[in-house]
Regions:
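ATP/NTP phosphate-donor binding region
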Residues: 1-78, 88, 124, 313
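ATP/nucleoside-binding phosphotransfer catalytic cores, i.e., glycine-rich phosphate-binding loops
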Residues: 2-11, 18, 25, 195-197, ...
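Catalytic core of DAGKc-family lipid kinases
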Residues: 24-25, 38, 46-47, 55-57, ...
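N-terminal glycine-rich "phosphate-gripper" loop used for MgATP/nucleotide binding
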Residues: 80-84
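Short glycine/serine/threonine-rich phosphate/pyrophosphate-binding segments
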Residues: 85-90, 111
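Glycine-rich phosphate/pyrophosphate-binding beta-alpha loops
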Residues: 152, 156, 209-224, 288
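Gly/Ser/Thr-rich active-site loops/lids in small-molecule metabolic enzymes
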Residues: 167-175, 210, 218, 224-245
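A generic structural signal for short beta-strands and their flanking turns/coil linkers
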Residues: 187-189, 204-206, 229-233, 268-272
Length: 313
């Protein structure tokens, strides 16, 4: 099924503007980046930010409350310091507000930043956040919560659930590999998927993925055609079962040839519903959210404004 939508045409980037009058920083205090939060504060003050709101949180799940406080205080730009989990929580709170987000990638994988070309370089990330091109980007929404990079269930959800904070904190991306090896024998379950109102898949499956961007967990380029501004989500389902199947599948995915795998099917859509015969763990942007037998997923076009590198840079 061809569900590709017309992509919004690129427009000429706006000239660099002075920093917003009211800038809020929402920071995961346990994450490190460059010279740390002291350097960030110094750079923002030196850049001439008119009013600086500052919020630090010990866990990403506490970030939405701080984002809402920033919006209530008149924030014109929200800078997010942390990884994909922190970005997801803040994006969920900012969705539909029209207030831009600047990303300061201080996490383990920083996949949303990677897909947008935002470097792990504090001075440059700050420059992009203050003066970069502001793009209206899509978000996905699964069971009522927004995601920026991807969501998944089955093998993917189990992997994320077991790559717990302690393991991930100590070993970074290796944590995903380690836990992945523990789940390659994960069971397949009867899975029914409808895309934009039409039946698309009805068979045994081990994993279902929804992508807003191309590069997902583990740095794998799973969705070649994904763009975060095209009004659609990529939908992938895998029937791989066992170490040999998964080795072949992940090998193709790592090489950017997902659609060549005999164990993978991919399509695109705006609204997706999934039913499993047994509850499966699902995750979004690297954060596990428990088990469900039904998933309701949709794209929310232009939900989030993000400060991105200028193509001319």
């Amino acid at each position: 099924m061809d569900t590709r939508t017309a992509e919004r045409p690129d427009t000429a980037p706006a000239p660099a503007a002075p920093p917003a009058g009211v800038v809020a920083v929402v920071a995961h205090r346990k994450k490190t980046f460059g010279g740390g939060l002291d350097e960030l504060r110094s750079r923002l003050v030196g850049a001439g930010v008119g009013r600086l709101l500052w919020y630090e949180v010990p866990k990403s799940r506490k970030a939405p409350k701080r984002v809402r406080a920033a919006l209530d205080s008149g924030a014109e730009l929200v800078l997010v310091w942390g990884g994909d989990g922190m970005v997801q929580r803040c994006a969920d709170a900012l969705a539909g507000s029209g207030v831009p987000m600047g990303i300061l990638p201080a996490g383990t994988a920083n996949l949303f930043a990677v897909n947008l070309g935002i470097p792990v370089d504090l001075p440059e990330a700050v420059r992009i956040a203050l003066h970069g091109r502001r793009r209206e980007l899509d978000l996905g929404r699964i069971n009522g919560e927004h995601f920026a990079v991807m969501a998944g269930a089955g093998f993917d959800g189990d992997l994320i659930r077991d790559a717990d904070r302690q393991l991930k904190g100590r070993f970074g991306r290796i944590a995903y590999v380690w836990t992945g090896l523990r789940h390659v024998r994960g069971e397949c379950v009867r899975t029914r998927i409808r895309v934009d109102g039409a039946d698309w898949f009805d068979d045994e499956a081990s994993c279902v993925l929804f992508g807003n961007v191309g590069t997902i967990t583990g740095g794998i380029p799973a969705f070649d055609d994904a763009r975060p501004d095209d009004g659609a989500l990529e939908v992938g389902v895998s029937t791989a079962s066992g170490a040999v199947d998964w080795a072949r599948t992940l090998g193709r995915m790592a090489a950017g040839r997902s659609e060549e795998s005999p164990f993978v099917r991919i399509t695109r859509g705006r609204k997706i519903s999934v039913r499993f015969d047994a509850p499966k763990t699902y995750e979004l942007d690297g954060g596990a959210r428990g088990k469900a037998k039904r998933l309701k997923v949709k794209v929310v076009p232009g939900a989030l404004t993000v400060c991105c590198p200028d193509p001319a840079d």
